[in-house]
Each structure stands twice: as structure tokens, then as C-alpha cells.
Swiss-Prot record:
Molecular function per GO: acetylglutamate kinase activity; ATP binding
Name of the featured protein: Acetylglutamate kinase
Gene designation: argB
Alphabetical list of HAMAP family matching this protein: ArgB
Protein keywords: Amino-acid biosynthesis, Arginine biosynthesis, ATP-binding, Cytoplasm, Kinase, Nucleotide-binding, Transferase
Biological pathway: Amino-acid biosynthesis; L-arginine biosynthesis; N(2)-acetyl-L-ornithine from L-glutamate: step 2/4
CDD domains found in the cross-reference section: AAK_NAGK-C
Domain of life of the native organism: Bacteria
Catalyzed reactions per annotation: N-acetyl-L-glutamate + ATP = N-acetyl-L-glutamyl 5-phosphate + ADP
EC number(s) reported in the record: 2.7.2.8
Length: 301
């Protein structure tokens, strides 16, 4: 019995020590905006989903203004398959035609968005699900992707259909929600001035939102620990110039390149710091914001 009591006392002591050490960081972020892009493996794991919702609720209860932006690529692919809708790809990128963009909006702004809202509300907070259409928050225009043919070296423009990029962000509605103690949960769907609906990459959408809000932090929850060096070791902090050099020497490659490019653009648009961290680690948001060592790679100007 003594051993059990001693173990319990040790656990409580560690918990108390964590809470005490977290206080300066809570004060640092009080009344600040933190945008969290939620995606990857964590979205498909119910335990991680509940932990994420609890983290977001705790941020709000600590006086921080959290804004959640979510993705949903795997869920969209699953619904398209169930509906018997075949996807066409250009250079590995899905072409979003008129029929598919309707499904995208249904899945992102509907089922996924409301599921996240429900998880946060279950933790005692007041979350509200929105997309770029609500309150004319975000306007998009058609995005074009250019590729270079490896044989002819001729540049070719890909038409990906209703894939867009944000060109205007109005923060008015988000500011009103912050004043109302509400937590916005945003789906990356937005209208164009042409009256069409566009599906936007969730990372890019989160970067645009964070820039418009001049967020203290933009957190990207991914399936990797952060930016790694060539030996596989986590790089804890980088500047824009260091990131550019790591791209040039091949340390940053593949799918990490567009992610860090989004990070750099967000910094140039007024975000103070951007963090790439592992969403598969329970409570990674709290570990990043409320501990000295953080939980991922911090990129600053």
C-alpha cells in the first residue's frame, strides 16, 4: 500500500510541477491568437481527437484565443469511393470538378467540421463551425499549378478545376467570435468573386487566416515530429534564411517543401512564429505552447 501511495504522490507532484512551470507560458500567450491546423493521422484517431479538443478547450480557458482550421483529404477520398465517383489526377494532384467540389464542401464544411465542433463543445467550450463563405470571411480565386516536363523541360500549367487559393481574408467575423468567447472551427472552402466554390489546401488556408489575424503562433499538426536534419534529428528552431538554405541543400525535400513555404509566407504576412509538430503525440499543442522545450520545429523571421 505504501508503494502505491508513494507512486500516486509522485504522479501528483509531477502534475503540480508541470502546472507551475506552465504559468509563465500561459501568461505569455494570454489574449493572443493561436491558429491550429488540425489534420493528418490525429483526425482519424478518436483518442487523439478527444485529446486535441481538450487542448483547445484548455487554451481558451487559459485566456488564449484559439482558431482551428482542419483538413480532411482521406475522408473526402473515402466518400468519393463510396459514391462511386472516380477521381482524375494531373501530375499526382486530384482534379476537383464541379461534382467533386460539392462532395468536398459537404464533407469538409459538414460532417468533419461538425464532429470537431462537437468534440470541443463536449469539453465545456463553445465552438462554432464555419467555412470561408460565412460572413464573406475568405474569397478565393482559381489556383494554377505549373510543372516542368522532365524530358522537354517545357513548363506546363495544370488545370485542377475548382482548387483555389485565398486572395482576401476579412477578420471581422473572427474578431466578433473572439469577443464572444467562441472558438471558430474553419473548413477550407471559400467562394470566388466569380460565384464558384473552391476547395483550398488546408495548410494554405490556415496560413492566410493566421496572417490576417496576426497570430502569435500558427501550429501545423502533422504526422512527423517537425523539420529533421539529414541525420534524422529534429531541428528545434529555424529562421526563414535557414529554411531556404535547407531547401537548397536538399535537407528539406518532398512534401515538406510546400509546408515550410506556407510557414514562410505566414511569417511575411505578420505571424510571429510557426511550428510544425507531430499531431500523433497526445497533447502536443500543450507541450509546444506551455513547456520550455516545445514539441516541434519553430520557424521565425
Amino acid at each position: 500500500m505504501d508503494n502505491v501511495e508513494n507512486c500516486a504522490a509522485d504522479v501528483f507532484e509531477r502534475q503540480a510541477a508541470f502546472l507551475s512551470s506552465a504559468l509563465p507560458y500561459m501568461q505569455k500567450y494570454e489574449n493572443e491568437t493561436v491558429v491550429v491546423k488540425y489534420g493528418g493521422h490525429a483526425m482519424g484517431d478518436s483518442t487523439l481527437g478527444r485529446a486535441f479538443a481538450r487542448d483547445i478547450a484548455l487554451l481558451k480557458q487559459s485566456g488564449i484565443n484559439p482558431v482551428v482550421v482542419h483538413g480532411g483529404g482521406p475522408q473526402i477520398a473515402e466518400i468519393l469511393m463510396k459514391m462511386g465517383i472516380e477521381s482524375r489526377f494531373e501530375n499526382g494532384l486530384r482534379v476537383t470538378d464541379e461534382r467533386i467540389v460539392e462532395v468536398v464542401e459537404m464533407v469538409l464544411a459538414g460532417s468533419i467540421n461538425k464532429e470537431i465542433v462537437a468534440l470541443i463543445n463536449a469539453e465545456g467550450e463553445w465552438a462554432i463551425g464555419l467555412c470561408g463563405k460565412d460572413g464573406n470571411m475568405v474569397f478565393a480565386e482559381k489556383a494554377y499549378k505549373t510543372v516542368i516536363d522532365p524530358d522537354s523541360h517545357i513548363e506546363r500549367v495544370l488545370d485542377l478545376g475548382f482548387v483555389g487559393e485565398p486572395v482576401e481574408v476579412d477578420r471581422t467575423l473572427l474578431d466578433l467570435l473572439a469577443c464572444s468567447e467562441m472558438i471558430p472551427v474553419l473548413a477550407p472552402v471559400a467562394p470566388g468573386h466569380d460565384g464558384k466554390t473552391y476547395n483550398i489546401n488546408a495548410d494554405i488556408f490556415a496560413g492566410a487566416i493566421a496572417g490576417a489575424l496576426e497570430a502569435k503562433r500558427l501550429l501545423f499538426l502533422t504526422d512527423v515530429p517537425g523539420v529533421l536534419n539529414k541525420k534524422g534529428k529534429l531541428l528545434k528552431e529555424l529562421t526563414i534564411s535557414e529554411v531556404e538554405n535547407l531547401i537548397k541543400n536538399g535537407t528539406i525535400s518532398g512534401g515538406m517543401i510546400p509546408k515550410v513555404e506556407t510557414c514562410m509566407k505566414a511569417l511575411q504576412n505578420g505571424v510571429e512564429g510557426v511550428v510544425i509538430l507531430n499531431g500523433k503525440t497526445p497533447h502536443s499543442v500543450l507541450l509546444e505552447l506551455f513547456t520550455e522545450q516545445g514539441a516541434g520545429t519553430l520557424i521565425v523571421s
